[in-house]
């Protein structure tokens, strides 16, 4: 049976629910993955779908976790966002359609020039040494 919205809210918490389901943004420099650089992968907190690797994470100083790319482009979708009087590109997870954050073209040039600015609340981190045990063994080769 599909999880209800209330069950989802209970499972992931209020902030993660607001971010992923209502396109909210957590306050800058408050997310647990902003200044966090352990080896592993980041998955959608709603569905567990694989999104980003620690290998592509960098310190941008923006106050949110920043990645140069998703593990695979097909794992995320991009959408025009004209909210708050700005023009941005929203990033959402493909499977769960969770709001993740935005992508900007001011990232490291040597890594493709993109900066995926992602809310910590939308992510769950899977440490390298737990990837196989938690069902993400197919992605261990990223770290070879």
From Swiss-Prot:
Signal sequence extent: none
Pfam families the record matches: SelR (PF01641)
Gene Ontology MF: a single term: peptide-methionine (R)-S-oxide reductase activity
Top EC class for this record: oxidoreductase
Example GO biological process: response to oxidative stress
Zinc as UniProt keyword: no
Gene3D superfamilies: Peptide methionine sulfoxide reductase (2.170.150.20)
Domain MsrB: 5-128
Record field: catalytic activity: L-methionyl-[protein] + [thioredoxin]-disulfide + H2O = L-methionyl-(R)-S-oxide-[protein] + [thioredoxin]-dithiol
Top-level lineage group: Bacteria
Active site: 117 (nucleophile)
InterPro entries hit by this protein: Met_Sox_Rdtase_MsrB, Met_Sox_Rdtase_MsrB_dom, Mss4-like_sf
Record keywords: Oxidoreductase
EC number assigned by the record: 1.8.4.12
Gene Ontology cellular component list: cytoplasm
NCBIfam families, per the entry: peptide-methionine (R)-S-oxide reductase MsrB (TIGR00357)
Family: Belongs to the MsrB Met sulfoxide reductase family.
Name of the protein in its database record: Peptide methionine sulfoxide reductase MsrB
Source species of the chain: Streptococcus agalactiae serotype V (strain ATCC BAA-611 / 2603 V/R)
Organism ancestry: Bacteria, Bacillati, Bacillota, Bacilli, Lactobacillales
